[in-house]
Amino acid sequence: MTYNFKNKLPNPHFTDLFDVTPQEVLENTKDLTLIDVREVSEYTGELGHAAGTQLIVLSTLPEKLKTIPTDKPVVFICRSGGRSSQAASFAKANGLTDVYNMQGGMLLWNQLLLPTEK
């Protein structure tokens, strides 16, 4: 099943991947699994994190991939969108199907003044 995001955009680095806007992630949080792939210090640091995210540091993703719930679409998040694009592409290549990258990461999330936790 593929989630029907209103504003999904082709990812500029991975042709098999779509980006979704921070606003749409916030609006649909309850219907999504949010995975933040930053380091612990970034997750709890200045930019904070979106409510409801699960932290899986990118370097640990290969061994933790099978722990990610697949009953909802999965959106990967990082600081600016680079690491989360890598994570989403890796997840797709390894069997997850309804996978997205959050455009602009937590930098854009903060620029848009969306709520964060620390």
Question: Residue spans of the language-model regions?
Answer:
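Rhodanese-like catalytic fold shared by cysteine-dependent sulfurtransferases
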Residues: 1-33, 40-73, 82-118
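Short, surface-exposed ligand- or partner-binding patches at beta-edge/loop junctions that are enriched
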Residues: 77-78
